[in-house]
Amino acid sequence: TVIVGFFVFNTDNFYPLNISGETNFEAITVTTALTFFAFLGIESATIPADGIKNPEKTIPKATIIGTTITLMIYILSSIALMGIMHPSEIANSSAPYADATGMILGEYGKNIIAIFAIISGIGCLNGWTLLQIEIPKNLAKNKLLSTIFSDTNSREVPYKGLIISTILVSILLLINYSKDLSNIFTYLILTSTFCTLILYFFISLSEIFILYKKRKPLKKFKSSLITGIPAFIFTVWMIVGVGKESIISGIVLLSFSIPIYFYQKKYAKS
């Protein structure tokens, strides 16, 4: 799509950029919140660190290189897509990249994109499945979840945690079954983004509080303030951008963890 798109590029498609009916700031806020989902879990390479060779070098390298390549692909493919299709066509398309390629290469091109989308989806599913079982397992090891999540089979796979988390995700999908596929996808993206942003919200200020608690000199705060404050402001902006429905859903989901946390805290001590 990127290569072919630039041969039939139409700059008129970029004007007007905002056709949502909202103000530019509101449109940018919502769009950024949706886009931010693609970069959630940028720290995910650290989660399976125990099973990675030479993690001190491999993880930073994989994170930086992988993010850079992904960012370039996203930017170039998005620009090419907008150069091929009018914004209204993109908004009404359930598969814009396939439709854009189909406009140039016909049905054959759409099928190629569909095949690549399936391959990409399977690859993403593998990665998310790994995280889906590793995070609960590590929480269980730290006595923040039941030990059932750290139980493994003969291949060292925490299969019980995988089954439980898969059931929970399936229930969430069934609750929103009345919506069409596009709305379900948007809802899940924004709700997932909100739940992750809560973590980023506290992390963005954590180093400052740690330094303050340890009574470190003011000069030690400089780098923390330079990175922490902008990150905090950006996180708050993104939380606002996900919308009321996703915020409420996220709060409900997160609230389920509160009794579990206190129960595990008491159980761990006993």
List each model region and its residues.
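Membrane-helix boundary/coupling elements in multi-pass transport proteins
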Residues: 39, 44-52, 110-147, 186-196, ...
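Helix-loop-helix junctions that connect adjacent transmembrane segments
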Residues: 1-114, 246-249
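Transmembrane helix-loop junctions and nearby membrane-interface residues
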Residues: 2-9, 78-85, 173-177, 204-211, ...
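A generic transmembrane alpha-helix motif of multi-pass inner-membrane proteins
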Residues: 3, 195-196, 205, 222-270
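Transmembrane helix-loop boundary segments of multi-pass membrane transporters
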Residues: 95-98, 112, 174-202, 217-222, ...
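TM-loop-TM module centered on a large, flexible mid-protein loop between adjacent transmembrane helices
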Residues: 64-126, 145-192
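Generic alpha-helical transmembrane segments of integral inner-membrane proteins
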Residues: 3, 68-80, 119, 163, ...
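Helix-loop-helix connectors at the membrane interface of multi-pass transporters/channels
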Residues: 52-56, 61-69, 125-163, 198-201, ...
